[in-house]
């Protein structure tokens, strides 16, 4: 298939620039793959469409304030986006500067803090901080809003560009399907008899990388670290053995589950994945997916197309556009069953 097969015309005013006042105020477009029927609801109603015994798998990765601003010894401005923390003091980052940095260069930050460039690794730079990197980011870092949110980060983003169940620090972009869940929705889901389990996948900046190849099969996915625990494997197998559904909350949860089942059976693991899911992929674990509405020609639209069918995906997205759904990270959600 070609990249253009996944194009749709999205009015710019449908790209959500801010979250709604309440997380569960988001709209919810529900699609049933068997009946090909869909309906329009509010996200707070989602428990009504889940069944006792269903297993929701959520990504508990926590967004770090990964964007830093500093300057070189010459005074030239430097902007960093931390891609991956590799140790207490070391990390890989994207760096923007007027002139490319080299090994041993220093980057000066506020409050007398500084970073040292150790070496270049392809498009990234391995750097070392003058103190624990997580502490430094929490002091000076900015929330790394996606490129399609056309504004600077604000104080509200520290809370709202984060799921209420985020626990494991490491993502530079939010697992956005989880942003709609508040404590009331989680309580209603549990009261319904639905089980919840967690995976961790640290979302990298590569999630926003466009597909540049004409043939989508030629696209090389970015790599992200994930972990699937023995407890999660047990929960998935228990659900499957009872004939219950495993529903991924977000494409990151789905990609983690499918990556851990590449051999046909879900196994515990902690490693990198660059799995690329597009039409023709045979799903091994996931029976349902909760996800936002994604960019035209993106790998995430290709994943949704693989899950519900290409024509069905394009028709569903056109329905969302016609009904003025809000798109992307701070936008509305879909439940695909």
Curated annotation (Swiss-Prot):
Transfers and isomerizes the ribose moiety from AdoMet to the 7-aminomethyl group of 7-deazaguanine (preQ1-tRNA) to give epoxyqueuosine (oQ-tRNA). It is an enzyme of class 2 (transferase). Monomer. GO terms for cellular component: cytoplasm. It is found in: Cytoplasm. Keywords: Cytoplasm, Queuosine biosynthesis, S-adenosyl-L-methionine, Transferase. Its EC number is 2.4.99.17. This is S-adenosylmethionine:tRNA ribosyltransferase-isomerase. Pfam families: Queuosine_synth. Disulfide bonds: none annotated. GO terms for molecular function: S-adenosylmethionine:tRNA ribosyltransferase-isomerase activity. It comes from Legionella pneumophila (strain Lens). Belongs to the QueA family. GO terms for biological process: queuosine biosynthetic process; tRNA wobble guanine modification. Its main location: cytoplasm. NCBIfam families: PRK00147.1, queA. Pathway: tRNA modification; tRNA-queuosine biosynthesis. InterPro entries: QueA, QueA_dom1, QueA_dom2, QueA_sf. It catalyses: 7-aminomethyl-7-carbaguanosine(34) in tRNA + S-adenosyl-L-methionine = epoxyqueuosine(34) in tRNA + adenine + L-methionine + 2 H(+).
